[in-house]
UniProtKB/Swiss-Prot annotation:
Its main location: membrane. The lineage of its organism: Eukaryota, Viridiplantae, Streptophyta, Embryophyta, Tracheophyta. Residues 534-657 form the FAD-binding FR-type domain. Residues 336-495 form the Ferric oxidoreductase domain. Residues 148-159 are annotated as: EF-hand-like 2. Belongs to the RBOH (TC 5.B.1.3) family. Ca(2+) binds at D184, N186, D188, R190, E195. It holds the Pfam family Ferric_reduct. Calcium-dependent NADPH oxidase that generates superoxide. This is Respiratory burst oxidase homolog protein B. Residues 319-383, 461-482, 530-659 are extracellular. One of its GO terms (cellular component) is membrane.
Amino acid sequence: MREEEMESSSEGETNKISRCKATGSDNPDEDYVEITLEVRDETINTMKAKATLRSVLSGRLKTMVKSLSFASRRLDRSKSFGAMFALRGLRFIAKNDAVGRGWDEVAMRFDKLAVEGKLPKSKFGHCIGMVESSEFVNELFEALVRRRGTTSSSITKTELFEFWEQITGNSFDDRLQIFFDMVDKNLDGRITGDEVKEIIALSASANKLSKIKENVDEYAALIMEELDRDNLGYIELHNLETLLLQVPSQSNNSPSSANKRALNKMLSQKLIPTKDRNPVKRFAMNISYFFLENWKRIWVLTLWISICITLFTWKFLQYKRKTVFEVMGYCVTVAKGSAETLKFNMALILLPVCRNTITWLRTKSKLIGSVVPFDDNINFHKVVAFGIAVGIGLHAISHLACDFPRLLHAKNVEFEPMKKFFGDERPENYGWFMKGTDGWTGVTMVVLMLVAYVLAQSWFRRNRANLPKSLKRLTGFNAFWYSHHLFVIVYVLLIVHGYFVYLSKEWYHKTTWMYLAVPVLLYAFERLIRAFRPGAKAVKVLKVAVYPGNVLSLYMSKPKGFKYTSGQYIYINCSDVSPLQWHPFSITSASGDDYLSVHIRTLGDWTSQLKSLYSKVCQLPSTSQSGLFIADIGQANNITRFPRLLIDGPYGAPAQDYRNYDVLLLVGLGIGATPLISIIRDVLNNIKNQNSIERGTNQHIKNYVATKRAYFYWVTREQGSLEWFSEVMNEVAEYDSEGMIELHNYCTSVYEEGDARSALITMLQSLHHAKSGIDIVSGTRVRTHFARPNWRSVFKHVAVNHVNQRVGVFYCGNTCIIGELKRLAQDFSRKTTTKFEFHKENF
């Protein structure tokens, strides 16, 4: 074949022209074909293919036209909408790869991993930063080696640099060719159906998508059907490129879209971090923001601290005027002042854990709920516990290090006024004090409270402490649960200790019981209610499902008169596991449903045993291919085989306040989505009811639709987790015709869109969803996003859609992103007209 230069197109030409012409050559007896491709403002070399005219037209001509059209697309891509998509597509090195920051780090790793100057294939992934995708990396390595025409299993540093340049280059077409070569192992320029199956299975393994791997034949057939329209049995590079560069259609002509673009631009400018040059003004602004966002907590803490200081001062001054002050001095005033705060705090610490009272107050009184931070009840319980620890320290140190020594070393004349408190016999040593009732009761209380306090810390309660096995058995939730019930003994000892105190003889001066009477009776009354209320009776288990990811869902009958609000939680007791333990779980059914449901993830001994019990029940019925086990009362003849359950509740939680907002932003991590699913179900039920009213099929339904828009973001690590709430996802897609609920599911095991490891999955997802309306990752009608959300973009999206509105942000899950979400809510509230109010779940 010979090449000739082609003249550039004329300036006024508007269309690309492809033409074939037969012309003469140096040898007039030989036929040849010249193919000329003219592109506006570009010049491309042409190729003359020497051969018989019939042969060229039947085969090679077709191939060359495809190649040249591919070249023309390369030139035109820079002017297309897909340009940005192409630039960020098919990246082999992810943004968060540990060594994906430059060649220097890769070279350093090569020096550490190389053996005799060569890097083995097994170390290639570690060297370039693709540590978690060994199979994919091996195929990439072999493809790069094949391109060099060798079959070596190790490479030099020079070869590694060449490979690095290829996989990190800016050219999408070069990366596309590498990806194509990974599949096209015989380098014939064609990908067969079997090779498509291999690359699908490889991509599924790299992204931990086991279900896609199980259905690889179906998905390979789908790709071949889409790309091999002529039924040739193979696809070529240009077919793959066409599919990979498909981008979602976007409407840019509507006024709303134009307005949103303008708002987006405005928000981006407003949200640029700025720093006020005046430090005083900046400090004042930060203080004002702090008070506006935390005023409920501030007034409660201020009141609590003020009461503690007042009680301490009152008792301090009282004892300063007494005779004992002349012998014991300020030691006794500090001891008695701290003792008074201890009485108050030991009474107060019970109130935040009176769950029924708190639930009743936050449900029945909006006024009280608007000024009291009920969401922080457990945090306040911990703050009061810290206050008790400080009080114990001051009280004990003042006695042991100051009071008692001064009393032991007092002269007879000095001790004379103390005889009416201690008797004629003078104390001789510390043992004398310890033998007294107030001595041994005080020490016992301190020991018991210390045990309960230590075992309540998260590193012990959640078995995070690095302890020997023999000691590890003494930690965990069970240890926390039972040690906290030592408070019964502590309160009995506290009353005894207060009654036998040395320096107060009159009964009306022994005030400990006065402080404790109301809180203790209230708490005792609550425990009696839990024991005898209808909600604490046995419930009938209607359905059980065991999902991938160690999640157990229980569907139970709703007790008569049982009323709750979406977002609340209940306590569950299973006597077959432990007759004494009650564990809290968010309700996942909506208040309008005729059943109760919870989803329980196994994270400890109790939940593991509960799942094991119900798994045995679920093994008899038929199972689905995904590993989902189900047992249904409608299919079972003997209900008694279900373990007996008791429930207690419902109890209030932050998520129940969602009805105070027209717009909701719901964020759940993993199993933390449970209270939010209940909210979604409630909004969905309202949509169904509204549709029934509009159709006239049911005129007796209460028309209550407070929520106008709900954005739900659910982030989970495993593909199997997406099955937990697949039913509600499909219902939203079916009934929410007006788009009131916007669902976004994120699977973090899949590499972000644009990564070469997820490119085929993304392509396959689009094809399958377009054809069947089902997402291949979740198995629902809701498309799954990959990697993690950009939370700033999420807040911007909501702010653009809801100008001058209040948005309730409700989060439940791991604490890892609480800080980020809270900062974003504050930032957008301060700099935009959309006000985000952040709420988080406590347990």
